[in-house]
């Protein structure tokens, strides 16, 4: 009786109330929805604007959906409105998109569209603004919490009380209560000069910025001081410090700043650290702060043995948390922000590769774990600045990214737990040689401009350095069957690399970029020549081609650097050369880099190292470059 009463109390035609989890588009087409934001079905049909979810927590929606016919009518109305909006957006966006595609450089390769790869594990990207984002993959706890918080309206943070003081306190550096990061800020006149020098000397080699976007924020920084943010301030200080390091002192004197010249002596690297700490970077990652950290890591911290692994590891994990390993176009980010993220990621991949080469463990960034596209030039950059310069900058970062990806595969095999056999090493050597040959022919077919000649020469220099690393372990095994070929191959590559390095450093045409070369000394090529001289059965004279070449390289170094930030490798190289010259009975009077000059330049004192200078294996262990 009770059962009959209960069933009879229901209104005829009334269905049980059920939460609607599928998007409206999938529900209408009766498709299985994966509840993504957007779902895979809407991604596949390129109708992500139609991927609408109804809030299950609001009763007025539930009451409407108790009656099926009204629900269908509501869905039809919503979808018709969305379709109309999509049509208008497509009409407006088609022309601008075609303009972007038509103005892309013909030198840059086309990349596949995001729509063609909709089967990827997309995950979720929360974008707070152009500089702050957070990535979470499916099945991760972060994604589950993100989903509950954003789509089920559960305020999971309401019971978590955080003390602001603990978050604001600097993690990296302690700032005096009487000091502020803004105390280091130069006048705008000086700032403008340093910004100009940065784009002239550094931007092509460390391309992490988009000029038009940067200048918009830069002008706001000076015109609206009340809106200044520590993250962007840290980026400015990183740019100032990089520009001063890359600009010769004699050029700085021509600026005629008068009393403002004192701002050229400010430690902007330290100011960058203060601003980075003030930005609360670890707890609130920001793209501007990440750009600043990448800049300073390349320009300043590459001269340290232990700093790169920890700093690059920090940079890498912050970038992963921000989702830079996923291409922004997959999440509907605008082309400019997506391109900035690609450039930053490209430099992080390169830093990871350099750290791997320095320390000797496999690269942490492995192909297949990221889908960020190759960087390229944007039309607004080409329009506002000399197009040849922009194309060259985009070509360089594009090529270096390709080189990093190819070389990363090689280092993964070379530095793995199981050492590859000699046959595999020879295969890697051939693969890299063919890769570089094709890369130059396809991407830099001509040498008509200074930038094209410079990029061709720089890529050729890199291509001749890589085989040395492959054959280096066999150079100390004189009695092995592999010694003869490895010695010949390494010697050939070292000679070519050093000759190309000398041209890069001595040709006035490339002088504005020479500072970058000395951040990564040619340790391996120089040691290969020194070993060859020691193993020679003939009497060596000062006019020997190998001796002349080594002296030429060292003659460039003091003239090209002129800063306090030197690397341990240069001191080891100088001392190694002096010991070899002494052993061969060669005069060191004409050697450009003497011990006296080293002291003036504040080099690391390699003479105090407890090293047997006849034990080359020990030298390698002390300097991994």
Curated annotation (Swiss-Prot):
Whereabouts does the entry annotate DNA binding, in residue ranges? 23-51
Q: Name one GO cellular component term.
A: cytoplasm
Query: SMART domains attached here?
Result: Fungal_trans, GAL4
Gene Ontology molecular function terms on file: DNA-binding transcription activator activity, RNA polymerase II-specific; RNA polymerase II cis-regulatory region sequence-specific DNA binding; zinc ion binding
Ranges annotated as biased composition (Polar residues): 93-113
Disulfide bridge partners, by residue number:
none
Keyword Coiled coil applies: no
Q: Which UniProt keywords apply?
A: Cytoplasm, Cytoskeleton, DNA-binding, Metal-binding, Nucleus, Transcription, Transcription regulation, Zinc
Q: Which PROSITE patterns match?
A: ZN2_CY6_FUNGAL_1, ZN2_CY6_FUNGAL_2
Using the record, list the residue span of the signal peptide; answer none if the entry has no such feature. Answer: none
Which domain of life does this protein belong to? Eukaryota
User: Where does the protein end up?
Assistant: Nucleus; Cytoplasm, Cytoskeleton, Spindle
Q: Which GO terms describe its biological process?
A: DNA-templated transcription; positive regulation of pyrimidine-containing compound salvage; regulation of transcription by RNA polymerase II
> Residue ranges of region Disordered?
93-119
Q: What is this protein identified as?
A: Uncharacterized transcriptional regulatory protein C139.03
What's the source species for this entry?
Schizosaccharomyces pombe (strain 972 / ATCC 24843) (Fission yeast)
């Amino acid at each position: 009786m009770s059962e009959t009463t209960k069933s009879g109390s229901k209104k005829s035609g009334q269905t049980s109330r059920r939460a609607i989890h599928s998007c409206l588009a999938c529900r209408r087409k009766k498709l299985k929805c994966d509840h993504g934001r957007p779902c895979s079905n809407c991604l596949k049909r390129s109708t992500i604007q139609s991927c609408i979810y109804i809030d299950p927590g609001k009763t007025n929606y539930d009451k409407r959906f108790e009656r099926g016919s009204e629900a269908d009518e509501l869905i039809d109305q919503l979808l018709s409105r969305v379709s109309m909006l999509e049509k208008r957006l497509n009409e407006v966006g088609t022309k601008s998109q075609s303009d972007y595609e038509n103005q892309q450089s013909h030198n840059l390769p086309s990349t596949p569209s995001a729509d063609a790869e909709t089967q990827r594990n997309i995950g979720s990207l929360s974008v707070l603004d152009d500089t702050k984002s957070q990535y979470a993959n499916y099945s991760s706890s972060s994604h589950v919490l993100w989903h509950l918080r954003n789509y089920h309206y559960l305020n999971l943070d309401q019971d978590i009380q955080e003390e602001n003081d603990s978050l604001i306190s600097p993690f990296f550096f302690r700032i005096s209560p009487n000091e502020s990061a803004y105390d280091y800020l130069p006048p705008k006149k000086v700032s403008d000069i340093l910004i100009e020098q940065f784009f002239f000397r550094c931007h092509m080699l460390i391309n992490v910025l988009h000029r038009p976007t940067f200048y918009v924020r830069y002008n706001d920084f000076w015109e609206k001081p009340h809106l200044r943010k520590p993250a962007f301030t840290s980026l400015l200080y990183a740019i100032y410090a990089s520009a001063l390091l890359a600009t010769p002192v004699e050029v700085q004197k021509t600026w005629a700043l008068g009393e403002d010249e004192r701002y050229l002596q400010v430690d902007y690297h330290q100011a960058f650290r203060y601003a980075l700490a003030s930005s609360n970077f670890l707890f609130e990652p920001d793209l501007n702060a990440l750009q600043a950290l990448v800049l300073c890591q390349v320009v300043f911290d590459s001269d340290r043995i232990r700093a790169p692994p920890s700093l690059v590891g920090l940079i890498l994990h912050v970038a992963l948390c921000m989702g830079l390993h996923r291409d922004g176009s997959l999440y509907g980010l605008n082309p400019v922000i997506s391109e900035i993220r690609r450039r930053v990621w490209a430099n992080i991949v390169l830093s990871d590769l350099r750290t791997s080469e320095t320390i000797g463990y496999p690269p942490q960034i492995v192909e297949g774990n990221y889908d960020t596209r190759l960087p390229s030039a944007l039309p607004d950059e080409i329009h506002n600045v000399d197009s040849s310069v922009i194309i060259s900058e985009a070509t360089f970062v594009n090529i270096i990214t390709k080189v990093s990806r190819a070389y990363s595969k090689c280092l993964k095999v070379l530095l793995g737990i199981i050492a590859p056999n000699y046959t595999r090493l020879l295969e890697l050597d051939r693969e890299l040689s063919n890769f570089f040959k094709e890369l130059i022919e396809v991407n830099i077919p001509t040498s008509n401009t200074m930038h094209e000649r410079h990029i061709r020469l720089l890529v050729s220099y890199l291509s001749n350095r890589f085989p040395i690393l492959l054959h280096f372990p066999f150079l100390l095994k004189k009695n092995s069957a592999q010694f003869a070929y490895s010695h010949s191959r390494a010697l050939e590559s070292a000679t070519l690399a050093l000759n190309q390095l000398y041209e890069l450093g001595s040709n006035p045409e490339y002088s504005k970029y020479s500072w970058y070369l000395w951040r990564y000394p040619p340790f391996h090529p120089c040691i290969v020549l020194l070993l060859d001289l020691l193993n020679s059965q003939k009497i060596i004279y000062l006019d020997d081609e190998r001796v002349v070449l080594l002296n030429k390289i060292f003659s460039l170094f003091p003239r090209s650097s002129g800063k306090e930030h030197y690397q341990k490798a240069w001191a080891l190289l100088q001392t190694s050369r002096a010991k070899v010259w002494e052993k061969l009975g060669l005069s060191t009077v004409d050697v450009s880099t003497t011990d006296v000059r080293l002291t003036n330049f504040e080099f690391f004192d390699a003479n105090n190292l407890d090293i047997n200078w006849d034990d080359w294996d020990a030298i390698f262990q002390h300097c991994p470059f």
